[in-house]
Amino acid sequence: MIDKREPVPFEVYEPGVYLHGTKADLAVGEMLVPGRESNFEAGRVMNYVYFTATLDAATWGAELSAGEGRGRIFVVEPMGEFEDDPNVTNKKFAGNPTQSFRSREPLRVVGELVDWVGHSPEKLQAMRGGLQRKEPGQIED
């Protein structure tokens, strides 16, 4: 039986597997590259591509990114060096418990998770409210 539960914060999806949540229509083999518009701030070009090792963080990306329809979660492979995402590292929690990363190098799409479960409507509404209170440019690009 497959466990159909909400994602658990800080729980690594599978060791060595990286995820990217978005509403973009991507295919296996495509590259995610820096230099595209932010999913969270209209008109802002991003210098990095972001990804995570946790299903929870990828789910937030899929649910909160710009665009219509249901989000998607892709399995990605970093094509170069990457670092802890400074937007979340050592902020609310010590270290990088969300296992969130960024890179100036491309990420290759190697698969897609198709049967993931999203956050509850209440959690989603609370997160959207928190993001609306952030000042433009508060997230490093």
What are these regions (language model features)?
Residues 23, 30-31, 66-141:
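Active-site and NAD+-binding cores of ADP-ribose-processing enzymes
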Residues 55-69:
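Short active-site loop/helix that positions an aromatic residue
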Residues 1-49, 63-64:
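ADP-ribose/NAD+-binding catalytic cleft of ART/PARP-like enzymes
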